[in-house]
């Protein structure tokens, strides 16, 4: 093997190229690779964190939805109870009002009945007095008394 100046020049040039590459080219390449690796790792971590946060958000949303449904059901139940209470109150008020009206009507009927009885008593008294006057004005005759009383009975009946 023949070592000549060309081979020696090539070796020196190669060594200078390796040194230059190691000194000036290789560190920025390694730095770029490290930065890229770091960015990829950060991206994966961010994706994992985002996935975890999304799962937490879904859980929170599910819990909030369940709570909202429970609250809505409770509101509906309370509204139903209130409506039933209002219906019951209305029924009770209507029953009380009906009983009051019925009591007033009975009272009015009783008053009218008493008035009618009183009027009938007055008329019977007047007829009895009239009959007694007629009996006393006439002579005492049993046959006439019977006729007068029969006539009085017809007037009453």
Curated annotation (Swiss-Prot):
F(1)F(0) ATP synthase produces ATP from ADP in the presence of a proton or sodium gradient. F-type ATPases consist of two structural domains, F(1) containing the extramembraneous catalytic core and F(0) containing the membrane proton channel, linked together by a central stalk and a peripheral stalk. During catalysis, ATP synthesis in the catalytic domain of F(1) is coupled via a rotary mechanism of the central stalk subunits to proton translocation. Component of the F(0) channel, it forms part of the peripheral stalk, linking F(1) to F(0). The keyword Transmembrane applies. It is found in: Cell inner membrane. Pfam families: ATP-synt_B. GO terms for molecular function: proton-transporting ATP synthase activity, rotational mechanism; proton-transporting ATPase activity, rotational mechanism. Its main location: membrane. One of its GO terms (cellular component) is plasma membrane. It comes from the Bacteria. It is a single-pass membrane protein. Belongs to the ATPase B chain family. SUPFAM superfamilies: F1F0 ATP synthase subunit B, membrane domain. This is ATP synthase subunit b 1. Keywords: ATP synthesis, Cell inner membrane, Cell membrane, CF(0), Hydrogen ion transport, Ion transport, Membrane, Transmembrane, Transmembrane helix, Transport. F-type ATPases have 2 components, F(1) - the catalytic core - and F(0) - the membrane proton channel. F(1) has five subunits: alpha(3), beta(3), gamma(1), delta(1), epsilon(1). F(0) has three main subunits: a(1), b(2) and c(10-14). The alpha and beta chains form an alternating ring which encloses part of the gamma chain. F(1) is attached to F(0) by a central stalk formed by the gamma and epsilon chains, while a peripheral stalk is formed by the delta and b chains. The chain crosses the membrane at residues 7-29.
